[in-house]
Amino acid sequence: MLSPKRVKFRKMFKGRMTGLAHRGSDVSFGTYGLQALEPGWVTSRQIEACRVAMTRHIKRGGKVWIRIFPDKPITKKPAETRMGKGKGSPELWVAVVKPGRVMFEIEGVSKELAETAMSLAAAKLGVKTKFVAREEAVTHEG
């Protein structure tokens, strides 16, 4: 599972997911990509499940890039604990995804195979996505 090696602070504010992704909205490494259509948190477990699903489906051919990294710690208080007494301990790591962000990319496989691999990955995510090719990836600037 992906997680940062070191962090400056153990706990982070919840934050707000407003606006569109200005960076990382183009397919830049591979030929095909999976682009987010809505904001959300993608956990390190979800990212790993997507990676495994895609690499198993494309077998030996092709290369997969993961364009997001879970760098935000999410805290959780123990079960049946009264409110107060401070913030809970870090439980999991998430990547904050905004609409337009390309999360995964594939190269070296046919369009049909890439599309089915991306749909397998999309089923593991908690955000709506769409399949994009390098030439038709939409940038949200302006």
Curated annotation (Swiss-Prot):
GO MF, one annotated term: rRNA binding
Gene Ontology biological process terms, A to Z: translation
Annotated gene: rplP
UniProt entry tagged with the keyword Magnesium: no
Organism: Gemmatimonas aurantiaca (strain DSM 14586 / JCM 11422 / NBRC 100505 / T-27)
Family according to the record: Belongs to the universal ribosomal protein uL16 family.
Record flagged with keyword tRNA-binding: yes
The protein's role, per its UniProt record: Binds 23S rRNA and is also seen to make contacts with the A and possibly P site tRNAs.
Name of the protein described by the UniProt record: Large ribosomal subunit protein uL16
